[in-house]
Amino acid sequence: MNKWSRLYVITVRRTFPGRRNIVLTQYWNKSKKMSDESNDVKWNDALTPLQLMVLRDKATERPNTGAYLHTNESGVYHCANCDRPLYSSKAKFDARCGWPAFYEEVSPGAITYHRDNSLMPARVEICCARCGGHLGHVFEGEGWKQLLNLPKDTRHCVNSASLNLKKD
């Protein structure tokens, strides 16, 4: 198998005001994906193909398409695969990035952090601590604490496909 057959491509089109469409492409290596056999992870049979791609294969849903992007309902967001509580709706804020954003997880240890070198500069990937499902990425020092008067200057950029909201 050559190196090109091992690469997968996700293409996202974004329109910027006054400019042509810019195609942003993310490449990742097949070996970075989670195998079905690894770590005794059981994948929920009720997951949609998109949820499987995001949680297991570390894909990213298209921006501004997620079910929870504009949701303001009170509750706790759980992992779509293993049902572990991950984020409180109280920690959700509008970062206008195209994905739901949270400034902290529901409790310490709910998520794990991993270095992601798939794009430059390197990012920090966030995963469910129980099943290892890919949630998204975390960004620090963007100024949200001062801009929106948040307790932390952290943005957890999370795919809606990796979450289920359990309303209060």
Swiss-Prot record:
Present with 799 molecules/cell in log phase SD medium. This is Peptide methionine sulfoxide reductase 2. PROSITE patterns: MSRB (PS51790). It comes from Saccharomyces cerevisiae (strain ATCC 204508 / S288c) (Baker's yeast). Its EC number is 1.8.4.12. The keyword Electron transport applies. GO terms for biological process: cellular response to oxidative stress; protein repair. Disulfide bonds join C97-C157.
